From Swiss-Prot:
Pfam families: Ribosomal_L20
Keyword Lipoprotein recorded: no
Similarity comment: Belongs to the bacterial ribosomal protein bL20 family.
Top-level taxon of origin: Bacteria
NCBIfam families attached to this UniProt entry: rplT_bact
Protein name (database record): Large ribosomal subunit protein bL20
Stored Gene3D superfamilies: 6.10.160.10, Ribosomal protein L20
Role summary: Binds directly to 23S ribosomal RNA and is necessary for the in vitro assembly process of the 50S ribosomal subunit. It is not involved in the protein synthesizing functions of that subunit.
Any one cellular-component term (Gene Ontology): ribosome
PROSITE patterns: RIBOSOMAL_L20
InterPro entries per the UniProt record, alphabetical: Ribosomal_bL20, RIBOSOMAL_L20_CS, Ribosomal_protein_bL20_C
Organism, scientific name: Mycobacteroides abscessus (strain ATCC 19977 / DSM 44196 / CCUG 20993 / CIP 104536 / JCM 13569 / NCTC 13031 / TMC 1543 / L948)
Amino acid sequence: MARVKRAVNAQKKRRTILKASKGYRGQRSRLYRKAKEQQLHSLTYAYRDRRARKGEFRKLWIARINAAARANDITYNRFIQGLKIAGVEVDRKNLAELAVSDAAAFTALVEVAKAALPEDVNAPAGEAA
């Protein structure tokens, strides 16, 4: 049987890892073993944070909607409740965009939400006074 030499494969593997770890500080960009370990961590963080990013954006949208809603004398909670009762199906991303870029349209939505809300704050959502 012929002898299998793996020098080329090993060099390619190391080169790939070191290329991917460019930009890391210190030994993590120069030494293969350190670079490999850092690369594993980096990929783990990237995977985790791609999922966390979705929650972060939702928090940002809610903060923007709340600020704009309070400027129109209604809380975020009551605003969303009013929109649901009125049957307005606009997601938080678009509501936040309206709040930032088109104040008049957002104010119109606030008026729709206020009109749909029951007069009595403690009344159930389905029963308008």
